[in-house]
């Protein structure tokens, strides 16, 4: 095989790998860990939101939310985490997978937290579990 053909094939393979890397949907950047009295929502960036069930005063499942602007934290293609500000809440804490529309808004005495996990369905299930756990701690 000629050198030009080898280089051509190499470039084609490289382009295919790059396209796959860009368009493949990797695992969600947000994970959760459920403990007895709290829930941890963790971003790949290392940012963690600690939700203590007994401190939840009110919660809502939203099908969409205007996240606003970042104050500090991450604003990546898939992960939004840290402290953000929008017109509705002012400053609040967030840890979400940006490709998931649904999110859970949690109100405590001291702050507002916005979280979601890998899919709309998983986020809705998590919301139902949080409602039950928050009721059980009252």
Predicted features and spans:
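Non-transmembrane, membrane-adjacent beta-strand/coil modules in membrane-associated proteins
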Residues: 42-53, 57-109
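Short, structured coil/loop segments at alpha-helix boundaries
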Residues: 4, 44-46, 119, 123
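N-terminal recruitment modules of adaptor/scaffold proteins
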Residues: 5, 13-14, 35, 102, ...
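Alpha-helical transmembrane spans
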Residues: 1-31
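Conserved beta-hairpin
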Residues: 21-52, 58
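Context-gated lysine
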Residues: 2-3, 8, 37, 42, ...
């Amino acid at each position: 095989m000629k050198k030009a053909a080898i280089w051509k094939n190499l470039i084609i393979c490289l382009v295919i790998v790059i396209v796959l890397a860009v368009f493949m949907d990797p695992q969600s950047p947000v994970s959760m860990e459920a403990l007895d009295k709290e829930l941890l929502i963790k971003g790949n960036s290392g940012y963690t939101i600690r939700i203590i069930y007994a401190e939840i005063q009110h919660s809502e499942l939203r099908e969409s939310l205007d996240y606003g602007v970042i104050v500090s934290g991450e604003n990546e293609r898939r992960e939004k985490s840290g402290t953000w500000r929008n017109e509705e809440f002012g400053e609040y804490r967030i840890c979400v997978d940006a490709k998931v529309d649904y999110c859970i808004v949690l109100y405590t005495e001291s702050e507002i937290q916005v979280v979601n996990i890998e899919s709309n369905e998983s986020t809705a299930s998590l919301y139902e579990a949080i409602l039950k756990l928050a009721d059980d701690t009252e």
